[in-house]
Regions:
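N-terminal secretory signal peptides and thylakoid transit peptides that target proteins
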Residues: 2-19
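C-terminal segment of N-terminal export signals and the immediately downstream linker at the start
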Residues: 25-43, 47-50
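A short beta-strand-turn-helix
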Residues: 48-67
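Short active-site neighborhood of thiol/selenol oxidoreductases, capturing the structured segment around
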Residues: 62-80, 192
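Loop/turn elements at helix/coil->beta-strand transitions in domains of secreted/extracellular proteins
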Residues: 64-67, 98-102, 130-133, 160
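Structural microenvironment flanking redox-active thiols in thiol-disulfide oxidoreductases
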Residues: 80-128, 139-145
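Short, internal strand/loop/helix patches
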Residues: 122-159, 164-165
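Thiol-/selenol-based redox modules, centered on thioredoxin-like
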Residues: 160, 164-216
Length: 216
């Protein structure tokens, strides 16, 4: 009897450790370059990256505007959760409808998961009925490193004064289940609401969850 109970305890404990390990792998350790990356409460660093339309887009061009930066990888199951449920598109439309600039960035290196050409990125925007202001291609990962983007999705909010006021996860449900979108605390929406009303962001930093950004 004792042996049976001990075995059950071992299996249960082992299962818990496995589950915890799997959950932890969605965030992972921060790379060394994150130490010098953009920080909440400081001016958002300017950058310029090519859009899928072939024109360079710089953050500086949107002075006086609230800007959302969304790091994405269409093959990542965590990203798919938010697009297949329509959650990301709804948030994009809600934000841009209020004058917010929404820039979607793809930092996957050539040959890595999530890498797409400009035409493929535009096709994804169309088929998923996404509504960003622009999709930017960051093949060399320079913008991603500048902001310390480690996961997809990884979200940032810049206020009208150019300050970085939010960085982290899209919400508090680090799973791939579409059903978990409902009832989740959406940190990005909350940050945008605070900015719109002139209030400080209640939760300015969270730990992003998802697939690691596929840098070269």
């Amino acid at each position: 009897m004792r042996e049976t109970m001990s075995r059950r305890h071992f299996l249960t404990t082992t299962g818990i450790f496995i589950l915890v390990g799997q959950a932890a792998s969605t965030v992972g350790p921060s790379p060394s370059w994150c130490a010098t990356a953009a920080k909440v409460g400081e001016p958002a660093p300017d950058f310029t990256a090519p859009s899928t339309k072939g024109t360079p887009v710089g953050l500086d061009a949107y002075k006086g505007k609230v800007v959302v930066l969304e790091w994405t990888n269409h093959e990542c199951p965590y990203v798919r959760k938010h697009y297949e449920s329509g959650n990301m598109q709804a948030l994009q439309r809600e934000a841009t409808g209020q004058g917010v600039i929404w820039l979607t960035l793809i930092s996957s290196a050539k040959g890595e998961q999530g890498f797409v050409s400009a035409a493929q990125a535009d096709e994804l925007t169309t088929t998923r009925k996404a509504a960003p202001t622009a999709v930017l291609l960051d093949e060399k990962g320079s913008v991603g490193h500048l902001y310390g983007a480690t996961n997809t999705p990884h979200m940032y909010v810049v206020d009208k004064t150019g300050m970085l006021v939010y960085a982290g996860a899209i919400d508090d449900r680090p799973t791939t289940r579409r059903s978990d979108v409902q009832g989740a605390n959406n940190y990005v929406r909350a940050a945008l609401d605070s900015v719109a009303t002139g209030q400080p962001v209640k939760t300015p930093v969270t730990r992003a969850y998802g697939c690691t950004v596929k840098y070269s």
